[in-house]
């Protein structure tokens, strides 16, 4: 057996051991530990809205991120057991309204038990390209068409192509970190 063959077999053996360690580590992460870890991943607070054949609906989410700028696309994650899930799935349009620091009350309204019909009585709303409700004084609003969805675990991931954007300058973002609302502050 050549040195190269021995080295290759040794590397393959090590890779096999690493894969096993990775599988064991993955299997040891429970839901509570994952959620605790995710609470330390600061994120913007968004009110996600829709309107269409299935009706008007909205919820609060931090599970939003950009995918690509060509074409402008972002993703939104929504639990399939959420009361608003079918409305969003059927409408296939949504608006990601990123809240400003002074709008924590809207996060609580759209994230709580407030009846859907009463949620849109708070804030000032308009529409852009898709007819999904746009919060007029949100930090930024991304008006989107859902172009693809993917089921992962308990959630669907909606891939959303941005059709229109509205910006409000001069405001600070509302963030969620360590299970609390906060504002970002520049450190450099």
Curated annotation (Swiss-Prot):
Give the enzyme's main class according to its UniProt record, as a single word.
oxidoreductase
Biological process (GO) annotations held by this record are: nitrogen utilization; uracil catabolic process
Q: Which InterPro entries match?
A: Flavin_Rdtase-like_dom, NADH-dep_flavin_reductase, RutF, Split_barrel_FMN-bd
Recorded GO MF terms:
FMN binding; FMN reductase (NADH) activity; FMN reductase [NAD(P)H] activity; riboflavin reductase (NADPH) activity
Q: What does the record give as the organism's lineage? A: Bacteria, Pseudomonadati, Pseudomonadota, Gammaproteobacteria, Moraxellales
Reported EC number(s) for this entry are 1.5.1.42
Q: Which family does it belong to?
A: Belongs to the non-flavoprotein flavin reductase family. RutF subfamily.
Species this protein is from: Acinetobacter baylyi (strain ATCC 33305 / BD413 / ADP1)
* Organism superkingdom: Bacteria
The chemistry this enzyme catalyses reads: FMNH2 + NAD(+) = FMN + NADH + 2 H(+)
Biological function: Catalyzes the reduction of FMN to FMNH2 which is used to reduce pyrimidine by RutA via the Rut pathway.
Write down what this protein is called.
FMN reductase (NADH) RutF
**Pfam (any one):** Flavin_Reduct
Keyword set includes NAD: yes
Q: Does the keyword Oxidoreductase apply?
A: yes
Keywords from the named record: Flavoprotein, FMN, NAD, Oxidoreductase
């Amino acid at each position: 057996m050549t040195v190269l063959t021995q080295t290759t077999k040794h590397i393959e053996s090590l890779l096999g051991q690493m894969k096993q360690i990775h599988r064991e580590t993955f299997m040891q992460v429970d839901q509570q530990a994952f959620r605790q870890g995710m609470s330390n991943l600061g994120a913007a607070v968004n009110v996600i809205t829709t309107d269409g054949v299935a009706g008007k609906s909205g919820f609060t989410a931090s599970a939003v991120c950009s995918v690509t700028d060509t074409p402008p696309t972002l993703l939104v994650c929504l639990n399939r057991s959420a009361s608003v899930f079918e409305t969003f799935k059927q409408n296939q349009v949504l608006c990601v309204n990123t809240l400003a620091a002074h709008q924590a009350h809207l996060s609580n309204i759209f994230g709580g038990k407030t009846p859907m019909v009463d949620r849109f009585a708070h804030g000032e709303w308009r529409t852009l390209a898709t007819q999904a409700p746009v919060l007029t004084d949100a930090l930024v609003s991304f008006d989107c068409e859902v172009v693809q969805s993917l089921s992962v675990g308990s959630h669907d991931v909606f891939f959303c192509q941005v059709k229109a954007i509205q910006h409000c300058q001069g405001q600070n973002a509302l963030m969620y970190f360590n299970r609390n609302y906060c504002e970002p502050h520049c450190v450099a």
